[in-house]
Amino acid sequence: VRGLAWVTVGSMAANLCSYLVHLPASRWLGPAAYGEFASLLQLVLVLAVPALALQTVVARQVVRGAGAAQMRALGYRIALGAGVLAAVAVPIAAAGLHTRAGTAAAALAAAPALVLLAVEQGLLQGERRFGRLAALLGIAGAGKLVFTVPGLLLGPGPALLGTTVGALVAAAVGRALAGDPAGTGTAPDAGVRAVLGASSVQLVLAVFASLDLLLSRPVLGAAAAGTYALGAVAAKVAFWLPQAVGVVFYPQLATPDRARGALRTVVGLLTALGLACVAGAAVCAPLATMLAGEEYRPVQGLLWLFAAQGALLALLQGLLLYAIAIERTRMALFAWAVVAVEAAILLTLPHTPAEMITAAALCALAAVMVVGAVVTVSARRASGSRSPRSATRPASAGH
């Protein structure tokens, strides 16, 4: 419980810093430039998939006895790959998002830096040093705020470059916090292939969390996309606020005789927090125009729906973390099928922000239902393959 509290505080601090970036950005850049800025930030989330995957693999391997040197060596290889992927993606992103190549490059430069940060977070997570992990999360969020906001005065490109600097500073601090634990040496080797498997899961989550915002600019136009981007902040809050649940319970999900009980706890907590986020968005909706300006009024009444989408994606994330923990990443194929349907729908049907978020939320609900059914069947089969005593042993919630 104490670990959950620590990571919740750290995650909330990091998320608060991220959202504070959006307030001056929406005012100083204007709807059109802010839409460009927000879309590129979402693209960074997609290219941060190797980092997210690496953190889960590092945490899982540390639970099984891996040491820091082994995991950092893996991290350097993944960072190199992320840098190459980011370089290749620059012209594609510039053309697809109707932005300049320099601005796209400034955004995508964050990808390898986030990988280096993820190694240290994974080490702390796997060792259950949640107090230090919470501190690192807060430092990473503060770095993003401190280095990004001044850049807004110069435009989207310099601001986006600030996210890279913030991530590099946080990675250096994270190395000091994590130290050099040797591990037990009993963990099976996990190489790039393991990270690629986890990446398939994290990528589908990133695409789900980003697809509607990435497509809003070409589908709705620059001005409407800027309005939509502000509403998407509510989705981000609902998606990232419960992040601590997955972080704290992931080591238990990776422990066979605790996995099923931990899964039930994760689903219950994410559902409760999601409902709270939807209610909070409905109550706080009038603050949107007060904080961001009257030009964003069209999205005010939709904030609860954005929050519902984010809450559903948080629940989907919890289900797919179970897939990574038990090394059954092929479950992500079911989510990919829903993503393909969502892309087709968003490119053809919506003409307004209301229509786009409605379609995106319904697709998120469909993904939760499909993946939830697959995970339930898998958990029951795994339970049946163990002894009744070990299968029904209650999970300890981070005591």
For each feature predicted by the language model, list its residue ranges.
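Interfacial segments at transmembrane-helix termini and the short loops linking adjacent helices
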Residues: 31, 94-110, 283-311
